[in-house]
Regions:
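N-terminal small/glycine-rich loop or linker at the start of catalytic domains
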Residues: 1-16, 68-73, 126-128
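N-terminal glycine-rich anion-binding loops that anchor highly charged ligand groups
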Residues: 1-6, 28-47
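Alpha-helix-loop-beta-strand connector modules within alpha/beta enzyme cores
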Residues: 49-78, 117-129
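Glycine-rich, proline-tolerant flexible connector loops at the mouths of alpha/beta enzymes
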Residues: 37-63, 102-111
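Catalytic beta/alpha-barrel core
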Residues: 78-82, 99-110, 128-129
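Short, acidic/polar
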Residues: 20-30, 83-93
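Glycine-rich anion/phosphate-binding loops
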Residues: 17-26, 105-112
Length: 129
């Protein structure tokens, strides 16, 4: 069994749409040091959400830069709200070496997002759903 830790993403809803650089780095360091295998982080509303009216303390690119030292210690990725999908967000995730994007949709709507999942996989990124 593998456990995904989404504290850095979903937990950020408690403080707004994301954690500060200091807290993000502190938690990435702690989670990887304690061998959490899969870590989801970034804007609580998902990659690209800052451009859709959901600003976080950091931009997606700033979160991605912050994660670079930890990419070889765990599968690190971000949430992608399927309704806010934009191809450039998948490109950005691939450019920064994310291991996965977790594509979220409303219950029963998964069939509407096969193109988004295909795009994620075509960029060499795991697509969690």
């Amino acid at each position: 069994m593998k456990i995904i830790d989404c504290t850095l993403r979903d937990g950020a809803n408690v403080v707004g749409n994301g954690f500060s650089a200091e807290l993000t780095e502190l938690m990435l360091r702690g989670l990887t040091k304690n061998h959490y295998p899969i870590i989801e982080f970034g804007n609580a509303k998902g990659i690209g959400a800052d451009k859709k009216g959901f600003p976080a303390p950091l931009t997606d690119e700033e979160y991605l830069q912050l994660a670079q030292p930890f990419l070889d210690r765990a599968e690190i990725g971000m949430f992608l709200n399927a309704k806010r999908y934009e191809p450039e967000n998948v490109e950005l995730a691939a450019q920064y070496g994310l291991a996965f994007l977790r594509c979220g949709s409303d219950a029963g709507d998964a069939h509407l997002y096969t193109d988004q999942i295909r795009d994620i996989k075509d960029h060499g990124i795991k697509a969690y759903f």
